[in-house]
Amino acid sequence: MKILFQADQSLSYGINEMSKYLAFEIAAGEYTVKARQIDGHDLSVCVKGKEINIIYAEKCHFFRALGLAIQNINEGKEDFEISEKPAFRSNGPMFDVSQGGAAFNLKTMKKILCQLSLMGLNMAMIYCEDSYEVQNRPYFGYMRPRYSEADMKELDDYAYELGVEMIPCIQTLAHLPDPLRWKVFADVKDYTECLLVGEPKTYEFIRDMLISASRPFRTKKIHIGMDEAGSLGRGKYMDMFGYKPTTQIMHDHLEKVMEIINELGLEPMMWDDMFFRCYGTHGYHQPDNPVPEEVKAAVPKGMKCVYWDYYHFDRSHYEGVIPRHKELSDEVIFAGGIWTWVGFSLAWSKTLKTTEVALDVCKKMGISDIIATVWGDNGTECLANTTLIGCQLFAELGYHDNIDMDEFAARFKFCTGGELADFENLELLDKNPLTEPLKDPSNYNASKYLMWQDILTGLCDYNIDGYALNDHYEGLAEKFKAAIGRNGQFDNMFEFSYHVANVLAIKSEMGLRLTRAYKAGDKEALLDIAKVQLPDLKARMEKLRLVHMKNWFELYKPLGWDIMDMRYGSLFARIDSAIMEILAYLDGSLERIEELEQERLPYHGEEGPIKYLNYFGHIVSASRIAPKA
Protein backbone atom coordinates (compact mmCIF):
# COMPACT_ATOMS: atom_id res chain seq x y z
CA MET A 1 0.00 0.00 0.00
CA LYS A 2 1.31 3.45 -0.98
CA ILE A 3 0.33 6.35 1.28
CA LEU A 4 1.14 10.05 0.89
CA PHE A 5 1.05 12.05 4.14
CA GLN A 6 0.01 15.65 4.57
CA ALA A 7 0.74 15.98 8.27
CA ASP A 8 2.76 17.95 10.77
CA GLN A 9 6.51 17.43 10.55
CA SER A 10 6.55 16.18 14.15
CA LEU A 11 4.87 12.97 12.95
CA SER A 12 7.44 12.20 10.25
CA TYR A 13 9.79 10.00 12.27
CA GLY A 14 6.93 7.98 13.73
CA ILE A 15 5.29 7.58 10.33
CA ASN A 16 8.55 6.23 8.97
CA GLU A 17 8.80 3.72 11.84
CA MET A 18 5.18 2.64 11.35
CA SER A 19 5.82 2.13 7.63
CA LYS A 20 8.43 -0.50 8.52
CA TYR A 21 6.12 -2.21 10.97
CA LEU A 22 2.90 -2.07 8.91
CA ALA A 23 4.67 -2.54 5.57
CA PHE A 24 3.29 0.46 3.70
CA GLU A 25 5.26 2.71 1.37
CA ILE A 26 5.42 6.46 1.98
CA ALA A 27 4.72 7.69 -1.54
CA ALA A 28 2.01 9.09 -3.77
CA GLY A 29 -0.23 6.35 -5.01
CA GLU A 30 -3.24 4.67 -3.46
CA TYR A 31 -4.12 6.85 -0.45
CA THR A 32 -3.49 10.33 0.94
CA VAL A 33 -3.59 10.97 4.68
CA LYS A 34 -4.53 14.49 5.80
CA ALA A 35 -4.00 15.01 9.52
CA ARG A 36 -4.97 17.85 11.85
CA GLN A 37 -4.09 18.19 15.51
CA ILE A 38 -6.76 19.78 17.72
CA ASP A 39 -6.10 19.84 21.46
CA GLY A 40 -8.79 18.10 23.47
CA HIS A 41 -10.44 16.64 20.37
CA ASP A 42 -11.65 13.06 20.11
CA LEU A 43 -9.75 10.76 17.80
CA SER A 44 -11.52 10.57 14.43
CA VAL A 45 -10.92 8.88 11.09
CA CYS A 46 -12.87 9.57 7.92
CA VAL A 47 -12.09 7.58 4.79
CA LYS A 48 -13.73 8.65 1.53
CA GLY A 49 -12.43 7.26 -1.67
CA LYS A 50 -8.65 7.48 -1.53
CA GLU A 51 -8.53 10.21 1.11
CA ILE A 52 -7.97 9.50 4.80
CA ASN A 53 -8.74 12.41 7.13
CA ILE A 54 -7.49 12.12 10.71
CA ILE A 55 -8.12 14.49 13.61
CA TYR A 56 -6.13 13.83 16.76
CA ALA A 57 -5.05 15.46 20.01
CA GLU A 58 -1.88 13.45 20.77
CA LYS A 59 0.67 11.72 18.59
CA CYS A 60 -0.33 8.26 19.76
CA HIS A 61 -3.96 9.08 18.86
CA PHE A 62 -2.77 9.80 15.32
CA PHE A 63 -0.98 6.46 15.09
CA ARG A 64 -3.96 4.59 16.50
CA ALA A 65 -6.18 6.36 13.96
CA LEU A 66 -3.78 5.52 11.13
CA GLY A 67 -3.85 1.88 12.21
CA LEU A 68 -7.65 1.84 12.36
CA ALA A 69 -7.80 3.25 8.84
CA ILE A 70 -5.37 0.70 7.40
CA GLN A 71 -6.98 -2.18 9.30
CA ASN A 72 -10.46 -1.37 8.00
CA ILE A 73 -9.20 -0.83 4.46
CA ASN A 74 -7.45 -4.21 4.62
CA GLU A 75 -10.75 -5.74 5.75
CA GLY A 76 -12.39 -4.48 2.55
CA LYS A 77 -14.24 -1.42 3.85
CA GLU A 78 -14.34 1.53 1.47
CA ASP A 79 -16.02 4.64 2.92
CA PHE A 80 -16.25 4.78 6.70
CA GLU A 81 -15.92 7.00 9.74
CA ILE A 82 -14.57 6.11 13.19
CA SER A 83 -14.67 8.31 16.25
CA GLU A 84 -13.20 7.39 19.64
CA LYS A 85 -12.87 9.29 22.91
CA PRO A 86 -9.96 8.32 25.19
CA ALA A 87 -11.31 7.52 28.63
CA PHE A 88 -8.00 8.11 30.39
CA ARG A 89 -5.41 10.87 30.39
CA SER A 90 -2.60 8.31 30.46
CA ASN A 91 -2.69 4.57 29.91
CA GLY A 92 0.11 2.09 29.38
CA PRO A 93 2.25 -0.76 30.71
CA MET A 94 4.93 -0.97 33.37
CA PHE A 95 7.47 -3.68 32.55
CA ASP A 96 9.42 -5.21 35.44
CA VAL A 97 12.98 -5.68 34.17
CA SER A 98 14.58 -6.40 37.55
CA GLN A 99 12.98 -9.10 39.68
CA GLY A 100 13.20 -11.87 37.11
CA GLY A 101 16.43 -10.72 35.49
CA ALA A 102 14.69 -10.24 32.13
CA ALA A 103 15.47 -6.77 30.77
CA PHE A 104 14.31 -6.04 27.23
CA ASN A 105 17.12 -5.23 24.83
CA LEU A 106 16.73 -1.92 22.98
CA LYS A 107 15.54 -3.55 19.76
CA THR A 108 12.72 -5.36 21.56
CA MET A 109 11.71 -2.33 23.61
CA LYS A 110 11.54 -0.13 20.52
CA LYS A 111 9.35 -2.66 18.76
CA ILE A 112 7.06 -2.77 21.79
CA LEU A 113 6.90 1.04 21.93
CA CYS A 114 5.89 1.08 18.27
CA GLN A 115 3.10 -1.38 18.97
CA LEU A 116 1.94 0.52 22.05
CA SER A 117 1.60 3.67 19.96
CA LEU A 118 -0.30 1.78 17.28
CA MET A 119 -2.68 0.56 19.99
CA GLY A 120 -3.12 4.14 21.22
CA LEU A 121 -1.32 3.78 24.55
CA ASN A 122 0.55 6.92 25.54
CA MET A 123 2.65 5.86 28.54
CA ALA A 124 5.28 3.24 29.35
CA MET A 125 7.36 2.54 32.43
CA ILE A 126 10.35 0.30 32.96
CA TYR A 127 10.35 -0.85 36.59
CA CYS A 128 13.97 -0.85 37.74
CA GLU A 129 15.10 -1.94 41.17
CA ASP A 130 18.77 -1.94 40.17
CA SER A 131 18.49 -2.25 36.39
CA TYR A 132 19.91 1.19 35.65
CA GLU A 133 23.30 2.80 36.15
CA VAL A 134 23.68 5.13 39.12
CA GLN A 135 26.47 7.68 39.07
CA ASN A 136 29.43 6.78 41.28
CA ARG A 137 27.76 3.49 42.35
CA PRO A 138 29.40 0.73 40.26
CA TYR A 139 27.93 -2.07 42.41
CA PHE A 140 24.38 -0.89 41.77
CA GLY A 141 23.21 -3.33 39.12
CA TYR A 142 26.62 -5.01 39.00
CA MET A 143 26.52 -8.18 36.86
CA ARG A 144 22.81 -7.64 36.41
CA PRO A 145 20.87 -6.65 33.29
CA ARG A 146 20.87 -2.87 33.52
CA TYR A 147 20.37 0.11 31.25
CA SER A 148 22.96 2.82 30.78
CA GLU A 149 21.90 6.46 30.77
CA ALA A 150 22.46 6.43 27.00
CA ASP A 151 20.16 3.38 26.67
CA MET A 152 17.35 5.10 28.53
CA LYS A 153 17.76 8.35 26.61
CA GLU A 154 17.63 6.44 23.33
CA LEU A 155 14.39 4.75 24.40
CA ASP A 156 12.90 8.04 25.58
CA ASP A 157 13.78 9.74 22.30
CA TYR A 158 12.20 6.91 20.34
CA ALA A 159 9.07 6.82 22.49
CA TYR A 160 8.65 10.60 22.21
CA GLU A 161 8.49 10.41 18.42
CA LEU A 162 5.66 7.89 18.75
CA GLY A 163 3.71 9.86 21.35
CA VAL A 164 4.54 7.58 24.27
CA GLU A 165 5.70 9.19 27.52
CA MET A 166 8.35 7.12 29.24
CA ILE A 167 8.33 7.49 33.03
CA PRO A 168 11.12 6.19 35.29
CA CYS A 169 9.93 3.76 37.95
CA ILE A 170 12.34 2.90 40.76
CA GLN A 171 12.48 1.96 44.45
CA THR A 172 13.54 4.34 47.21
CA LEU A 173 12.84 2.24 50.30
CA ALA A 174 12.38 -1.54 49.98
CA HIS A 175 12.54 -4.10 47.14
CA LEU A 176 16.31 -3.62 46.79
CA PRO A 177 17.72 -7.07 47.69
CA ASP A 178 20.14 -7.30 44.77
CA PRO A 179 22.16 -4.13 45.36
CA LEU A 180 21.96 -4.44 49.15
CA ARG A 181 23.68 -7.83 49.04
CA TRP A 182 26.99 -5.99 48.51
CA LYS A 183 28.94 -4.80 51.55
CA VAL A 184 29.57 -1.44 49.88
CA PHE A 185 25.93 -0.64 50.72
CA ALA A 186 26.14 -1.80 54.36
CA ASP A 187 25.91 1.77 55.66
CA VAL A 188 22.52 2.31 53.99
CA LYS A 189 21.00 -1.12 54.69
CA ASP A 190 18.29 -1.68 57.32
CA TYR A 191 17.62 -5.33 56.47
CA THR A 192 17.86 -7.67 53.50
CA GLU A 193 16.06 -5.47 50.98
CA CYS A 194 15.28 -2.19 52.72
CA LEU A 195 17.19 1.07 53.01
CA LEU A 196 18.19 2.47 56.39
CA VAL A 197 15.91 5.37 57.22
CA GLY A 198 17.50 8.28 59.07
CA GLU A 199 21.06 7.58 57.90
CA PRO A 200 22.45 10.62 55.99
CA LYS A 201 24.31 8.34 53.55
CA THR A 202 20.95 6.78 52.61
CA TYR A 203 19.73 10.10 51.28
CA GLU A 204 22.95 10.74 49.39
CA PHE A 205 22.32 7.36 47.76
CA ILE A 206 18.67 8.17 47.02
CA ARG A 207 19.69 11.52 45.53
CA ASP A 208 22.08 9.69 43.19
CA MET A 209 19.31 7.23 42.26
CA LEU A 210 16.77 9.96 41.56
CA ILE A 211 19.21 11.96 39.44
CA SER A 212 20.38 8.94 37.44
CA ALA A 213 16.87 7.57 36.93
CA SER A 214 15.28 10.87 35.89
CA ARG A 215 18.00 12.58 33.86
CA PRO A 216 17.61 10.57 30.62
CA PHE A 217 13.88 11.32 30.36
CA ARG A 218 11.96 14.38 29.18
CA THR A 219 9.24 13.93 31.74
CA LYS A 220 9.49 15.27 35.26
CA LYS A 221 7.27 12.45 36.49
CA ILE A 222 8.87 9.67 38.48
CA HIS A 223 7.55 6.62 40.31
CA ILE A 224 9.48 6.20 43.57
CA GLY A 225 8.06 2.82 44.66
CA MET A 226 8.03 2.50 48.48
CA ASP A 227 5.73 -0.53 48.62
CA GLU A 228 5.78 -3.66 50.77
CA ALA A 229 8.38 -2.55 53.32
CA GLY A 230 6.90 -4.99 55.79
CA SER A 231 9.82 -5.12 58.25
CA LEU A 232 10.66 -1.43 58.11
CA GLY A 233 12.70 -0.33 61.11
CA ARG A 234 13.20 -3.81 62.53
CA GLY A 235 16.76 -4.45 61.37
CA LYS A 236 19.81 -2.22 61.76
CA TYR A 237 17.47 0.74 62.27
CA MET A 238 16.28 -0.68 65.60
CA ASP A 239 19.88 -1.30 66.71
CA MET A 240 20.75 2.32 65.96
CA PHE A 241 17.63 4.22 66.96
CA GLY A 242 15.60 1.82 69.07
CA TYR A 243 11.98 1.00 68.46
CA LYS A 244 9.87 3.58 66.67
CA PRO A 245 6.40 3.10 65.20
CA THR A 246 6.42 2.29 61.50
CA THR A 247 4.21 5.32 60.95
CA GLN A 248 6.91 7.61 62.31
CA ILE A 249 9.65 5.93 60.27
CA MET A 250 7.62 6.24 57.05
CA HIS A 251 6.85 9.89 57.81
CA ASP A 252 10.51 10.72 58.45
CA HIS A 253 11.65 8.93 55.30
CA LEU A 254 9.04 10.46 53.04
CA GLU A 255 9.83 13.92 54.35
CA LYS A 256 13.52 13.58 53.50
CA VAL A 257 12.88 11.99 50.09
CA MET A 258 10.38 14.72 49.22
CA GLU A 259 13.00 17.37 50.03
CA ILE A 260 15.27 15.84 47.38
CA ILE A 261 12.42 15.42 44.90
CA ASN A 262 11.33 19.04 45.29
CA GLU A 263 14.89 20.24 44.94
CA LEU A 264 15.21 18.29 41.68
CA GLY A 265 11.87 19.59 40.40
CA LEU A 266 10.36 16.12 39.98
CA GLU A 267 6.70 15.10 40.08
CA PRO A 268 6.43 11.96 42.24
CA MET A 269 4.02 9.09 42.50
CA MET A 270 4.26 6.07 44.79
CA TRP A 271 2.56 2.79 45.58
CA ASP A 272 0.23 3.67 48.44
CA ASP A 273 -0.07 0.35 50.31
CA MET A 274 2.31 1.38 53.10
CA PHE A 275 -0.04 4.16 54.16
CA PHE A 276 -2.67 1.52 54.86
CA ARG A 277 -0.32 -1.09 56.30
CA CYS A 278 1.54 1.29 58.61
CA TYR A 279 -1.52 2.90 60.08
CA GLY A 280 -3.36 -0.29 60.92
CA THR A 281 -6.29 0.09 58.55
CA HIS A 282 -6.72 -3.69 58.48
CA GLY A 283 -5.31 -4.55 55.11
CA TYR A 284 -4.69 -2.92 51.78
CA HIS A 285 -7.63 -4.27 49.80
CA GLN A 286 -10.33 -3.94 52.47
CA PRO A 287 -13.19 -1.66 51.37
CA ASP A 288 -15.12 -1.33 54.61
CA ASN A 289 -12.67 0.46 56.89
CA PRO A 290 -12.56 4.26 57.18
CA VAL A 291 -9.29 6.07 56.50
CA PRO A 292 -8.02 7.75 59.68
CA GLU A 293 -7.12 11.43 59.51
CA GLU A 294 -3.51 10.65 60.43
CA VAL A 295 -3.24 8.49 57.30
CA LYS A 296 -4.48 11.32 55.10
CA ALA A 297 -2.07 13.72 56.77
CA ALA A 298 0.85 11.34 56.13
CA VAL A 299 0.68 11.79 52.34
CA PRO A 300 3.05 14.59 51.30
CA LYS A 301 1.72 17.48 49.26
CA GLY A 302 2.26 16.85 45.56
CA MET A 303 2.46 13.06 45.91
CA LYS A 304 0.24 11.01 43.61
CA CYS A 305 -0.86 7.71 45.10
CA VAL A 306 -0.90 4.53 43.01
CA TYR A 307 -3.51 1.96 44.04
CA TRP A 308 -2.45 -1.46 42.77
CA ASP A 309 -4.95 -4.29 42.49
CA TYR A 310 -4.95 -7.18 40.01
CA TYR A 311 -6.87 -9.72 42.03
CA HIS A 312 -10.56 -8.95 42.25
CA PHE A 313 -13.45 -9.84 39.96
CA ASP A 314 -16.24 -8.03 41.82
CA ARG A 315 -17.30 -4.54 40.80
CA SER A 316 -18.41 -3.82 44.36
CA HIS A 317 -14.86 -4.37 45.59
CA TYR A 318 -13.39 -1.59 43.44
CA GLU A 319 -16.36 0.66 44.17
CA GLY A 320 -15.61 0.23 47.86
CA VAL A 321 -11.82 0.53 47.76
CA ILE A 322 -11.21 3.35 45.26
CA PRO A 323 -12.94 6.01 47.42
CA ARG A 324 -10.57 5.11 50.28
CA HIS A 325 -7.59 5.79 48.06
CA LYS A 326 -9.09 9.04 46.78
CA GLU A 327 -9.11 10.25 50.38
CA LEU A 328 -5.30 10.10 50.32
CA SER A 329 -4.68 12.07 47.16
CA ASP A 330 -6.49 14.37 44.77
CA GLU A 331 -5.15 12.26 41.90
CA VAL A 332 -5.20 8.51 42.34
CA ILE A 333 -3.56 6.35 39.70
CA PHE A 334 -4.88 2.82 39.23
CA ALA A 335 -2.49 -0.05 38.50
CA GLY A 336 -3.98 -3.27 37.21
CA GLY A 337 -2.04 -6.26 35.99
CA ILE A 338 -1.27 -8.45 33.00
CA TRP A 339 -0.85 -11.83 34.69
CA THR A 340 2.43 -13.31 33.44
CA TRP A 341 4.50 -13.48 36.61
CA VAL A 342 3.62 -16.84 38.14
CA GLY A 343 5.36 -19.21 35.76
CA PHE A 344 5.37 -20.26 32.13
CA SER A 345 1.83 -19.15 31.37
CA LEU A 346 -0.23 -16.04 30.68
CA ALA A 347 -3.33 -16.10 32.91
CA TRP A 348 -5.54 -14.55 30.24
CA SER A 349 -8.93 -15.18 31.84
CA LYS A 350 -7.90 -13.49 35.06
CA THR A 351 -6.30 -10.59 33.19
CA LEU A 352 -9.44 -10.13 31.11
CA LYS A 353 -11.97 -10.35 33.93
CA THR A 354 -10.14 -8.21 36.48
CA THR A 355 -9.24 -5.55 33.92
CA GLU A 356 -12.74 -5.24 32.44
CA VAL A 357 -14.30 -4.71 35.86
CA ALA A 358 -11.58 -2.49 37.32
CA LEU A 359 -11.30 -0.12 34.36
CA ASP A 360 -15.06 0.25 34.08
CA VAL A 361 -15.22 1.34 37.72
CA CYS A 362 -12.21 3.64 37.19
CA LYS A 363 -14.06 5.41 34.37
CA LYS A 364 -17.15 5.90 36.48
CA MET A 365 -15.15 7.12 39.49
CA GLY A 366 -13.03 9.64 37.62
CA ILE A 367 -9.65 7.88 37.64
CA SER A 368 -7.60 9.52 34.88
CA ASP A 369 -4.36 7.55 34.85
CA ILE A 370 -3.92 3.80 34.37
CA ILE A 371 -0.90 1.49 34.64
CA ALA A 372 -0.87 -2.10 33.38
CA THR A 373 1.76 -3.79 35.55
CA VAL A 374 3.81 -6.63 34.10
CA TRP A 375 5.72 -8.06 37.04
CA GLY A 376 8.69 -10.41 36.70
CA ASP A 377 8.72 -12.31 39.97
CA ASN A 378 11.12 -15.19 40.50
CA GLY A 379 12.50 -15.93 37.08
CA THR A 380 10.21 -14.55 34.37
CA GLU A 381 9.72 -17.93 32.69
CA CYS A 382 6.78 -16.52 30.72
CA LEU A 383 8.18 -14.65 27.72
CA ALA A 384 7.38 -10.99 28.19
CA ASN A 385 6.20 -10.27 24.64
CA THR A 386 3.20 -12.42 25.58
CA THR A 387 1.99 -9.41 27.54
CA LEU A 388 1.13 -7.51 24.36
CA ILE A 389 -2.32 -9.10 24.40
CA GLY A 390 -2.84 -7.50 27.81
CA CYS A 391 -1.61 -4.16 26.48
CA GLN A 392 -4.17 -4.47 23.68
CA LEU A 393 -6.86 -5.11 26.28
CA PHE A 394 -5.96 -2.01 28.29
CA ALA A 395 -5.87 -0.01 25.06
CA GLU A 396 -9.27 -1.10 23.77
CA LEU A 397 -10.90 -0.55 27.16
CA GLY A 398 -9.30 2.89 27.13
CA TYR A 399 -11.26 3.83 24.02
CA HIS A 400 -14.47 1.80 24.45
CA ASP A 401 -16.90 1.15 27.30
CA ASN A 402 -16.68 -2.57 26.58
CA ILE A 403 -15.21 -4.81 23.94
CA ASP A 404 -16.59 -7.26 21.43
CA MET A 405 -14.22 -10.24 21.44
CA ASP A 406 -14.40 -10.77 17.68
CA GLU A 407 -13.45 -7.15 17.11
CA PHE A 408 -10.77 -7.43 19.77
CA ALA A 409 -9.32 -10.50 18.04
CA ALA A 410 -9.16 -8.63 14.73
CA ARG A 411 -7.57 -5.61 16.38
CA PHE A 412 -4.97 -7.74 18.17
CA LYS A 413 -4.17 -9.56 14.93
CA PHE A 414 -3.65 -6.27 13.10
CA CYS A 415 -1.53 -4.60 15.79
CA THR A 416 0.67 -7.57 16.67
CA GLY A 417 0.07 -10.50 14.32
CA GLY A 418 -1.17 -12.71 17.15
CA GLU A 419 -4.20 -15.01 17.06
CA LEU A 420 -6.48 -14.55 20.07
CA ALA A 421 -7.66 -18.18 20.03
CA ASP A 422 -4.07 -19.41 20.30
CA PHE A 423 -3.28 -16.96 23.09
CA GLU A 424 -6.32 -18.16 25.00
CA ASN A 425 -4.72 -21.62 25.08
CA LEU A 426 -1.60 -20.36 26.87
CA GLU A 427 -3.28 -20.48 30.27
CA LEU A 428 -3.93 -24.20 29.78
CA LEU A 429 -0.35 -24.70 30.96
CA ASP A 430 -1.77 -23.97 34.41
CA LYS A 431 -5.47 -24.54 33.84
CA ASN A 432 -5.27 -28.32 33.79
CA PRO A 433 -7.16 -31.26 35.36
CA LEU A 434 -5.85 -30.15 38.77
CA THR A 435 -7.40 -26.71 38.61
CA GLU A 436 -10.28 -26.82 36.12
CA PRO A 437 -12.97 -27.23 38.83
CA LEU A 438 -11.71 -24.21 40.77
CA LYS A 439 -13.41 -20.80 40.69
CA ASP A 440 -10.12 -18.97 40.13
CA PRO A 441 -7.54 -21.34 38.63
CA SER A 442 -5.12 -18.49 37.96
CA ASN A 443 -4.01 -18.65 41.60
CA TYR A 444 -2.45 -22.03 40.83
CA ASN A 445 0.74 -22.18 38.77
CA ALA A 446 1.11 -25.89 38.14
CA SER A 447 3.37 -25.48 35.11
CA LYS A 448 6.08 -23.94 37.27
CA TYR A 449 6.23 -26.51 40.04
CA LEU A 450 5.66 -29.46 37.69
CA MET A 451 8.62 -28.25 35.62
CA TRP A 452 11.09 -27.59 38.42
CA GLN A 453 10.19 -30.13 41.12
CA ASP A 454 12.63 -32.97 41.68
CA ILE A 455 12.06 -36.44 40.25
CA LEU A 456 13.32 -38.40 43.26
CA THR A 457 11.98 -36.16 46.04
CA GLY A 458 8.92 -34.61 44.44
CA LEU A 459 7.48 -32.26 47.05
CA CYS A 460 4.31 -31.83 45.00
CA ASP A 461 3.69 -35.48 44.11
CA TYR A 462 1.08 -36.09 46.80
CA ASN A 463 -1.07 -33.20 45.58
CA ILE A 464 -0.97 -34.14 41.90
CA ASP A 465 -1.63 -37.86 42.33
CA GLY A 466 -4.69 -39.11 40.45
CA TYR A 467 -4.85 -36.47 37.74
CA ALA A 468 -4.25 -37.19 34.06
CA LEU A 469 -1.62 -34.50 33.67
CA ASN A 470 0.54 -36.23 31.08
CA ASP A 471 -2.43 -36.63 28.74
CA HIS A 472 -3.42 -33.00 29.25
CA TYR A 473 0.00 -31.68 28.32
CA GLU A 474 0.39 -34.07 25.40
CA GLY A 475 -2.80 -32.65 23.87
CA LEU A 476 -1.76 -29.09 24.69
CA ALA A 477 1.59 -29.58 22.99
CA GLU A 478 -0.24 -30.37 19.76
CA LYS A 479 -2.30 -27.17 20.08
CA PHE A 480 0.82 -25.09 20.49
CA LYS A 481 2.52 -26.88 17.61
CA ALA A 482 -0.42 -26.00 15.38
CA ALA A 483 -0.14 -22.33 16.39
CA ILE A 484 3.41 -22.05 15.04
CA GLY A 485 3.32 -20.44 11.61
CA ARG A 486 0.18 -18.33 12.05
CA ASN A 487 1.26 -15.96 14.82
CA GLY A 488 3.93 -13.82 13.19
CA GLN A 489 6.32 -12.40 15.78
CA PHE A 490 4.90 -14.81 18.36
CA ASP A 491 5.76 -18.00 16.46
CA ASN A 492 8.95 -18.37 18.53
CA MET A 493 6.92 -17.94 21.71
CA PHE A 494 4.54 -20.72 20.66
CA GLU A 495 7.52 -22.90 19.77
CA PHE A 496 8.74 -22.32 23.33
CA SER A 497 5.29 -23.10 24.76
CA TYR A 498 5.17 -26.28 22.67
CA HIS A 499 8.43 -27.47 24.21
CA VAL A 500 7.22 -26.59 27.72
CA ALA A 501 4.11 -28.73 27.20
CA ASN A 502 6.15 -31.46 25.51
CA VAL A 503 8.38 -31.74 28.59
CA LEU A 504 5.44 -31.70 30.99
CA ALA A 505 3.75 -34.44 28.93
CA ILE A 506 6.20 -36.90 30.48
CA LYS A 507 7.66 -35.06 33.48
CA SER A 508 4.40 -34.18 35.27
CA GLU A 509 3.83 -37.72 36.53
CA MET A 510 7.41 -39.03 36.31
CA GLY A 511 8.00 -38.97 40.06
CA LEU A 512 4.72 -40.77 40.72
CA ARG A 513 5.48 -43.48 38.16
CA LEU A 514 8.98 -43.95 39.50
CA THR A 515 7.82 -44.21 43.12
CA ARG A 516 5.04 -46.68 42.26
CA ALA A 517 7.38 -48.91 40.26
CA TYR A 518 9.94 -48.91 43.08
CA LYS A 519 7.43 -49.69 45.82
CA ALA A 520 5.82 -52.41 43.69
CA GLY A 521 9.22 -54.00 43.06
CA ASP A 522 8.62 -53.69 39.31
CA LYS A 523 12.20 -53.87 38.10
CA GLU A 524 11.18 -54.03 34.46
CA ALA A 525 9.35 -50.71 34.81
CA LEU A 526 12.31 -49.21 36.68
CA LEU A 527 14.68 -50.29 33.91
CA ASP A 528 12.41 -48.70 31.30
CA ILE A 529 12.33 -45.45 33.30
CA ALA A 530 16.14 -45.42 33.61
CA LYS A 531 16.96 -46.50 30.06
CA VAL A 532 14.12 -44.94 28.04
CA GLN A 533 11.90 -42.45 29.84
CA LEU A 534 14.46 -40.39 31.74
CA PRO A 535 16.83 -40.07 28.74
CA ASP A 536 13.80 -39.02 26.67
CA LEU A 537 12.91 -36.43 29.31
CA LYS A 538 16.46 -35.08 29.35
CA ALA A 539 16.49 -34.79 25.55
CA ARG A 540 13.17 -32.93 25.59
CA MET A 541 14.43 -30.62 28.31
CA GLU A 542 17.58 -29.80 26.37
CA LYS A 543 15.46 -28.84 23.35
CA LEU A 544 13.33 -26.66 25.63
CA ARG A 545 16.41 -24.99 27.10
CA LEU A 546 17.83 -24.19 23.68
CA VAL A 547 14.54 -22.75 22.41
CA HIS A 548 14.14 -20.78 25.64
CA MET A 549 17.68 -19.44 25.28
CA LYS A 550 17.03 -18.44 21.66
CA ASN A 551 13.94 -16.50 22.72
CA TRP A 552 15.72 -14.93 25.68
CA PHE A 553 18.62 -13.60 23.62
CA GLU A 554 16.22 -12.31 20.99
CA LEU A 555 14.07 -10.43 23.53
CA TYR A 556 16.30 -9.54 26.47
CA LYS A 557 19.75 -8.49 27.53
CA PRO A 558 21.99 -11.57 28.00
CA LEU A 559 22.64 -10.96 31.70
CA GLY A 560 19.84 -12.70 33.54
CA TRP A 561 19.87 -15.89 31.49
CA ASP A 562 22.30 -17.38 34.02
CA ILE A 563 19.34 -17.91 36.39
CA MET A 564 17.52 -20.05 33.83
CA ASP A 565 20.66 -22.01 32.92
CA MET A 566 21.13 -22.88 36.58
CA ARG A 567 17.55 -24.10 36.84
CA TYR A 568 17.78 -26.25 33.74
CA GLY A 569 21.23 -27.44 34.77
CA SER A 570 19.97 -28.62 38.14
CA LEU A 571 17.28 -30.68 36.42
CA PHE A 572 19.77 -32.28 34.05
CA ALA A 573 22.00 -33.22 36.99
CA ARG A 574 19.09 -34.66 38.96
CA ILE A 575 17.95 -36.73 35.97
CA ASP A 576 21.48 -38.14 35.71
CA SER A 577 21.49 -38.88 39.44
CA ALA A 578 18.12 -40.61 39.22
CA ILE A 579 19.32 -42.81 36.35
CA MET A 580 22.50 -43.73 38.25
CA GLU A 581 20.61 -44.56 41.45
CA ILE A 582 18.01 -46.68 39.65
CA LEU A 583 20.66 -48.66 37.74
CA ALA A 584 22.75 -49.10 40.88
CA TYR A 585 19.68 -50.41 42.69
CA LEU A 586 18.88 -52.78 39.84
CA ASP A 587 22.42 -54.23 39.71
CA GLY A 588 22.50 -54.63 43.47
CA SER A 589 25.25 -52.12 44.24
CA LEU A 590 22.70 -49.86 45.94
CA GLU A 591 20.60 -51.61 48.55
CA ARG A 592 17.66 -49.21 48.30
CA ILE A 593 16.66 -45.86 46.86
CA GLU A 594 16.10 -43.99 50.07
CA GLU A 595 14.44 -40.96 48.43
CA LEU A 596 11.66 -43.16 47.07
CA GLU A 597 11.00 -44.77 50.43
CA GLN A 598 10.00 -41.46 52.02
CA GLU A 599 6.28 -41.00 52.59
CA ARG A 600 4.84 -38.32 50.29
CA LEU A 601 3.02 -35.66 52.31
CA PRO A 602 0.63 -32.95 51.12
CA TYR A 603 2.45 -29.68 50.49
CA HIS A 604 2.05 -27.43 53.56
CA GLY A 605 -0.23 -30.14 54.99
CA GLU A 606 -2.99 -29.03 52.64
CA GLU A 607 -5.01 -31.33 50.40
CA GLY A 608 -5.81 -30.47 46.79
CA PRO A 609 -4.00 -28.31 44.23
CA ILE A 610 -1.09 -26.23 45.48
CA LYS A 611 -1.75 -22.51 45.41
CA TYR A 612 0.79 -20.06 44.00
CA LEU A 613 4.04 -21.95 44.55
CA ASN A 614 6.44 -19.49 42.95
CA TYR A 615 9.81 -19.64 44.74
CA PHE A 616 12.19 -21.97 42.93
CA GLY A 617 13.88 -22.93 46.19
CA HIS A 618 10.55 -23.94 47.72
CA ILE A 619 9.81 -26.21 44.74
CA VAL A 620 13.02 -28.15 44.18
CA SER A 621 14.01 -29.22 47.69
CA ALA A 622 12.94 -29.37 51.31
CA SER A 623 16.45 -28.15 52.16
CA ARG A 624 17.70 -24.59 51.81
CA ILE A 625 19.49 -23.93 48.53
CA ALA A 626 19.60 -20.13 48.81
CA PRO A 627 17.49 -17.45 50.47
CA LYS A 628 14.33 -16.76 48.49
CA ALA A 629 15.71 -18.49 45.37
For each feature predicted by the language model, list its residue ranges.
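Interfaces and regulatory segments of ATP-dependent nucleotide/adenylate/phosphodiester-chemistry enzymes
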Residues: 29-31, 38-41
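Short, well-ordered secondary-structure micro-motifs
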Residues: 45-46, 179, 234-235, 281, ...
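Catalytic zinc-binding patch centered on the HExxH motif and its immediate surroundings
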Residues: 40-48
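Substrate-binding groove of N-acetylhexosamine-processing glycoside hydrolases
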Residues: 2-28, 34, 75, 79, ...
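Short, flexible beta-strand-to-coil junctions
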Residues: 36-39, 57-59
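Feature activates predominantly on carbohydrate-active enzymes
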Residues: 2-4, 8-10, 50-263, 269, ...
